Amino acid sequence: MATPSNKNSKSHKRNRRGHIGLNVPNIVLDQTTGEYRVSHRVSPSGVYNGKQVIDKK
């Protein structure tokens, strides 16, 4: 069974975990509808790249 030979300090542990974190989604203002949406996704109204791609029922 592997056991640690030396104690890792708090700074060493935090340096190792520095890449772990939350990613902020890239939210943009849609030019055609004026709604906020995540980039490279269809807007809630069904518009993508200035074209209606999904018909709302």
Curated annotation (Swiss-Prot):
<comment type="similarity">
    <text>Belongs to the bacterial ribosomal protein bL32 family.</text>
</comment>
<protein>
    <recommendedName>
        <fullName>Large ribosomal subunit protein bL32</fullName>
    </recommendedName>
</protein>
<dbReference type="GO" id="GO:0006412">
    <property type="term" value="P:translation"/>
</dbReference>
<feature type="region of interest" description="Disordered">
    <location>
        <begin position="1"/>
        <end position="25"/>
    </location>
</feature>
<keyword id="KW-0687">Ribonucleoprotein</keyword>
<dbReference type="GO" id="GO:0015934">
    <property type="term" value="C:large ribosomal subunit"/>
</dbReference>
<dbReference type="Pfam" id="PF01783">
    <property type="entry name" value="Ribosomal_L32p"/>
</dbReference>
<dbReference type="InterPro" id="IPR044957">
    <property type="entry name" value="Ribosomal_bL32_bact"/>
</dbReference>
<keyword id="KW-0689">Ribosomal protein</keyword>
<dbReference type="GO" id="GO:0003735">
    <property type="term" value="F:structural constituent of ribosome"/>
</dbReference>
<dbReference type="InterPro" id="IPR002677">
    <property type="entry name" value="Ribosomal_bL32"/>
</dbReference>
<feature type="compositionally biased region" description="Basic residues">
    <location>
        <begin position="9"/>
        <end position="19"/>
    </location>
</feature>
<dbReference type="InterPro" id="IPR011332">
    <property type="entry name" value="Ribosomal_zn-bd"/>
</dbReference>
